[in-house]
Amino acid sequence: MSLDRKYAIASRIVREIRRDRRSIAMIIGAPVIVMSLIGFSFQTQKSVLNEAAPALIATMVMFFVFVLTAVSFLRERSQGTLERLLSTAVSRGDLLVGYLTGFLIFALIQSLIILMYTLFVINVDYAGKLWDIIFILLIVTITSVNMGIFVSTFARNEFQII
């Protein structure tokens, strides 16, 4: 497995997502809007929000990361990029690690946006260490990226993913 090939694939994914305004809106805008609505809905019931916050954060991270990864990977397949890469000398392992790394960069950014917005803008109280929360969120994020790639291999269009 070549580190250069993995890096090239991951950097191409990063460039593609950075150029796509819809993906950037999905990474930043959608989670902030949804978490704002949730925070506003529980504005008078702070204790309920504090109890539900861990599940909400995990659910939002899982949903948004899954959708971002699955839709982006499906777009790669539908545009023929994946098939062109498979016809080159790139091994399937390099391809998989490159795609995982590329998507994981934006998934981690999105997860941190959701977490920080929930903790510091909505002001959810949390017990424990922030690093413990980030570690659990990292596991959820990696799982969601893998699930997004897995499900997108069976989907024919974006509506089947959502």
Predicted regions and their residues:
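Transmembrane helix-boundary elements of multi-pass transport/secretion proteins
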Residues: 2-82, 92-112, 116-137, 141, ...
